[in-house]
Regions:
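Cell-envelope and extracellular/periplasmic
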Residues: 1-167
Length: 167
């Protein structure tokens, strides 16, 4: 409380927050596996595991924010089906071992090339990619493109951090 203003936070957890990004193996939701995990889908209940899902969005320029497809939710039978199966079981094990809340930010997109999840600088560590970029992208634009991609990634990560902090 400060003067006449009061800020009250409810249902707030402090613990681990993991960004779960990648391709179809990370995107595969629990509700896509009813025959494999029927009991888990019916009985999953853990207020210390929460997740949110980021909307799939294409962008050719940096974005200051991300759109959320599914807001923060605690794991229970009505929500667990929307969570990435890989992320859910990882969080379940992590929460059990660390005994702290675990938040999952799911930002996966099946079929995306691995390069799209790698920084521009990171790709240059692989000569075949570096040569391809150098030969196929106009050299003058390469530096500008690299900067824009990095700015976009930085803005995306900042946005995820804010979502993790403020839900």
């Amino acid at each position: 409380q400060s003067g006449n203003e009061k800020l009250e936070l409810k249902n707030l957890l402090l613990g681990e927050v993991w960004v779960c990004s990648g391709q179809s193996n990370m995107e595969w939701r629990m509700d896509m596996l009813p025959a494999t995990y029927p009991d888990e889908l019916k009985t999953a209940r853990n207020d210390d595991i929460r997740f949110m899902v980021v909307e799939k969005t294409l962008a050719t320029a940096p974005k200051a924010d991300v759109t959320v497809q599914r807001k923060w939710a605690a794991v229970d039978p009505s929500t667990v089906g929307n969570c990435s199966a890989v992320a859910y079981f990882y969080a379940k094990q992590l929460q059990k071992e660390l005994k702290v809340p675990v938040g999952l930010i799911v930002t996966a997109w099946g079929g995306t090339p691995a390069q799209s999840w790698t920084s521009f600088e990171g790709l240059h560590e692989f000569p075949n990619y570096s040569k391809n970029f150098t030969e196929n992208i106009h050299p003058i634009k390469l530096e500008d493109m690299s900067r824009k991609i990095q700015e976009g990634r930085d803005a995306f990560v900042r946005s995820l951090k804010e979502k993790a902090e403020y839900g």
